[in-house]
Every structure is written in C-alpha cells, then in structure tokens.
Amino acid sequence: MESIKKILDAVNNRLTGEETEITFEMNPNDVSTKKIDGLLMAGVNRISLGVQSYHDQELKALGRVHDSDSILEAKKILQDTNTTIDLMYGIEKQTLESFTSNLMRFLSSGINHLSLYQLTIEPNTIFYKKELFLPKEKDIERMEAIAKELLEQNGFQQYEVSSWSKPGYESLHNLNYWHFGDFLGVGPGSHSKISNDKKIVRYRKIKPLEGYIKNQKTTDLKTIVEDDLDLDIAMNLLRMKNGHQQRDLSIKLPKSFFEKYEKGISEGLLLKDKIGTTEKGYKFLNETIQLFF
C-alpha cells in the first residue's frame, strides 16, 4: 500500500486537479477493510470491482478465482465507497434467467455505474482452444435487450457501448478515451496515446514485470498518419451513445473523415447535427465503422 501511495503522491504533485478521478481495479476476493481504508487514504476515490457474474458456475467457466460469497463480502466492505462493477454476458452455459438474475443483483447493490461486456474469444487463448457451449446469437441479442430494459427502468443511461451509469456517475477516464483524448500509461503492459492533427502515436510498455524492470523502454510503437486517421477516430468517437459536438473534441477532424461521414448520413447511420450515430447506426456499430476504412 505504501508503494501505491508514493505513486499517487507523485502523480498528484505533477498532473492532477481537484476533480481527478482515481480508480483502482480489484477482484472481489482481494477486497478487505484494511486494503480499502489504505487505498482511500492514498487518494483513490473510485473502486472498479471485477464481479463478472454472481453465479459460481459462470465464474468457474470464466476461470475466476472468486465466488459469490466473496462478492457479497466485498459489497459489505464497499457499501460507502464510490464503486463500479464489471459484468459479462455470453458466458458459457449462461441462460437468459441467470443473466437477468445478475442484473437484478447488481441493481439491488445501489451501485451507480456498470461496465457490461460481451465475452469475446480471442485467438491463442485458453478459451479459444476449448470446445465451448456459448449462448446462441439470438440469446445474446435478447440479453442485450433485457439489459437495456432493466437498466433504463432503474435510472441508468447507456453513455458508451459497454458503459451504463446514473446521471453524474459517468467514468471520467472512459469519457476521455471516447472523446479521443490523449492518455499516458505508466508501468508494465500500460498503453498510451499522444496525438495531434497530423498523426496519432500509440505505444505499449513491456508486459511481464521482470522484463519491464530490466527495460522500461517503449515497445509496440504504432504511428497512425493522416491518411489512416479516419478509422481510428471513428472507432473511438462513435462508441459514445449521445455523440459529440465538434467544438468539444480535442482533435481537428480531417476532410476525408467528413466525406465518409456524409455517406453514413445518407444511409441513415450517422447524425447530421453532431458527430454520432443514429439508433440504427448504434445497433449496427461495426457495420457503421466499416464506412471509414
């Protein structure tokens, strides 16, 4: 905990302002009164809890080390702490009933922010090599519809593809990402983005801790030049549910972006009065983003 305090003190002395959001990610089994008190004393003001599911069978399918009992215990400890929860859907053997139960358990917690992610199977992972019994596409779509209905009924707004909150509880770092703001990553495996009107530079630090200690130089440096900016911009800006006023963006949009954007307007996928999608465009976001290739 002392190391965390030193890092946050160094950051606070250089970069942060009065309204800085400082989020610390934890798994439920890592939560204890002592740890939370220490984090709050160090300056953390938001806890991100990786619940994923309230059902032990689904947690086991995900390879998680915590269980439903540890989630309940963590909830008690965090009851007076600004908290966000991660949940997943599309989990192996997950049913509409168990997914609905997960949402109801979340809603009963009194927490004001939810990150809701669909399980995606990436190549070269343990899940990719296994035979999985995942929910069918029609059930995935039904889960998304159930989430929209229940969350909106309970005062939550979808402000980004995977993010729901009550008004005033939106994640500030999420908003920065999807408004195309820059960010600085510090530590093993961290990502950064630095941009101007002509190019975007993205880079990642070495991930294994031992390798990072030996060599803290940047790896995976990627420069996106003017000709390729359109897609990168679209993949970020169009995730925001309510769109953007151009004057609020931290980057000047290229002429080529607007040429492609006009096509999206004509197809009923993009808005005329601001940078964002229509309901149809948001529902078919991947197809909408294809316009910017």
Q: Language-model features: where?
A:
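C-terminal scaffold of the Radical SAM
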Residues: 1-250
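Short amphipathic alpha-helical interaction segments
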Residues: 251-266
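A short, conserved structural fragment
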Residues: 265-274
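Minor-groove-contacting beta-hairpin "wing" of winged helix-turn-helix DNA-binding domains
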Residues: 275-279
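Short, amphipathic alpha-helical interaction segments positioned at domain boundaries
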Residues: 280-293
